[in-house]
Amino acid sequence: MKTNKNLQHVKIDLERDSAYILERHCLINYACDCPWARKIPYEKYRANWFSNDGQQNGFLSAITESMKDPRTIADILKDELGETIGYLWVPFHGDDPDFVWADVQEIYVEEAYRGMGLASYLMGYAEEWAKKHGAKVIRSGTGCENISSQKLHQKMGYCQYRFEYEKVLK
């Protein structure tokens, strides 16, 4: 599959797409969560996440608020047959033209489409969009055990700029 041809970016419509992006958001969170949280089987993690309305509402509020900014990327990616193959959410931050940055909050490629260069395509797309819309920097985060995402970031020329720590309390 040529990743830059025959792909369609469709703006997220929360009435139509909220179930899809909530499911993928939960999968992304699990893949990027800390080691102790990932000891929980995914189905239990998912059940806990979806039982907390605050989690869902917080995420939907954040994406809704970010979409008020026309620079934000909030796209569902579809193939030439109209099948959903992933999604990308990249809000912008900063009002000072000398310090505007884009933040790759979520990038997701459906399992059946992985290994085809789509994640690289989406990251490249986000970078070009960010440059075109005045960002000086693009940021993206991942979990400490999400090796495939770390490799993608390294391949795309991203460098680590911060560490986060946690302590399991007993």
Where are the model-predicted features located?
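Acetyl-CoA-dependent GNAT
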Residues: C26-F99, Q105, V168
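Alpha-helical elements of Rossmann-like donor-binding domains used by nucleotide-donor carbohydrate transfer enzymes
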Residues: Y20, R24, G58-A62, Y121, ...
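Conserved acetyl-CoA-binding loop of GNAT-fold acetyltransferases
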Residues: Q154-F163
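Conserved GNAT acetyl-CoA-binding A-motif
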Residues: A130-G141
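Conserved acetyl-CoA-binding loop-helix of GNAT-fold acetyltransferases
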Residues: E106-V109, G115-E128, K132, I147, ...
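Conserved beta-strand-loop-alpha-helix junction that forms the acyl-donor binding cleft
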Residues: R114, S140-Q150, E166-V168
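Conserved N-terminal entry element of GNAT/NAT acetyltransferase domains
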Residues: M1-E43
